[in-house]
Amino acid sequence: MIVRSIHLGFEVPDTDASMATLYYAADEGALDAARLTGLVAADRSGSPWPLVIVLPGINVAPDSYRWLAIRLVRAGYCVATYANIGSLGPAGRGITPGVDMAALGPDIIASHCSATALGPLLDAIADLDEPVQGLIDFDRVAIGGHSAGGTVALHNTDPSWVSGLVCAFSFGGHTMTSMSLGHGEASVTAVPSKVPILLLAGADDGVVAASRDRYRNDDQAHDPVRRTFDEAIHRNQNDSWLVEIAG
C-alpha cells in the first residue's frame, strides 16, 4: 500500500474559493497503469475506510497537515484536508475552516451548525468517481482540526449537523469565545458533545497565550483548552480525553 491523493473543488456560500485534497490508500502494483494519468487505483483491502476531515487553522495551508493525513491513511483511514478562502474580518481575506460567525453570538451559539464547509465538502467527496468511489464509509466520519479549525470542530459535535459524525478532535482549539462577539469576559461556551471528543494542547502554547486579549482583560491564569474540557463537554460517558503535550 502507498498513499496517494486526488484534488477537488467544492462550493461554499459567501466564500471566494474552496479546494480539498483527499488522501487514500493506493495499490502499489497499479503504478505502471497510472504512468500517463497519475491516478493510481485504490488498495481495496482495507475498505470501506472511515473518513477524517481536517479543518485548518487561520491562514494555515492545508499541506501543513499532509504528514498527519499520510499517517492516518497508513492506519486505515481516508483523509481530507482543505482550504476555504473567505473573510477574516478586519484582517482581510484568507484561509479559514469555514464558519458562520453569526452562529457564534451569545443568543444563538450551539443551537445549529456553524461549520459552513463541512456539508459541501462531504457532498463533493460523495460525488467522486474512481479511484475512491464506493470505498469510503460515510457512516464513520471524524472531524478535527488545529487552532480555529479545532474550535469549529468542537462547536459542531452533533451528528444531526455533520452527517455520519462519530467523533471529533482538536489541537490548540478551545471554546472560550471572543468578547467581540458579545460574550462575557473569559466565558467558555458549551458544545453539543454528542460524540466522543479528544482535546490536545501544548503545555506551553505561545499562540494561545498571545491571543488572551481577545477573551479577557484580567490577569488571571489563562488555560482555555483545559477549561473547555472541564466546562464545555457535558458528555459524562468516560469517552472524551484531554492530552497535554510537552512544549
Please name every model-derived segment:
Residues 100-138:
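Alpha/beta-hydrolase active-site loop
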Residues 165-245:
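The feature captures the conserved acid-bearing segment of alpha/beta-hydrolase catalytic domains
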Residues 158-166:
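Conserved hydrolase catalytic core segment
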Residues 140-142, 167:
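Residue in the alpha/beta-hydrolase core beta-strand immediately N-terminal to the catalytic nucleophile
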Residues 54-58, 147, 173, 202:
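Glycine-rich His-Gly loop
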Residues 145-149, 153:
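Gly/Ala-rich beta-loop-alpha elbow adjacent to hydrolase catalytic centers
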Residues 42-49, 54-91, 177-178, 207-209:
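Short substrate-entry loop that stabilizes the transition state in hydrolases
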Residues 1-52, 64, 73-74:
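Domain-level recognition of soluble alpha/beta enzyme cores
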